[in-house]
Amino acid sequence: MPKMKTKSSAKKRFKVTATGKVIGGQAGKRHGMIKRTKKFIRDARGTTVLSEPDAKIIKGFMPYDR
């Protein structure tokens, strides 16, 4: 059976930690930030840990990154 391929888009956007959690950028920052609160903009910086259902999907995209 051939090897599974890693989705290159997922490889560029997400990282799996040593404990198995998936880290990715915060969503919802592309446009429309003028109506957001300063707290929302501040909290949306950096990265966040994905929820378990989302992390399971991303781990399926990266079979060798567990």
From Swiss-Prot:
GO terms for MF: structural constituent of ribosome
Record's GO cellular component terms: cytosolic large ribosomal subunit
Pfam families: Ribosomal_L35p
Keywords: Ribonucleoprotein, Ribosomal protein
GO biological process, one term: translation
UniProt keyword Ribonucleoprotein, yes or no: yes
InterPro entries: Ribosomal_bL35, Ribosomal_bL35-like, Ribosomal_bL35_CS, Ribosomal_bL35_sf
Gene3D superfamilies: 4.10.410.60
Family: Belongs to the bacterial ribosomal protein bL35 family.
Name this protein carries in UniProt: Large ribosomal subunit protein bL35
Primary gene name: rpmI
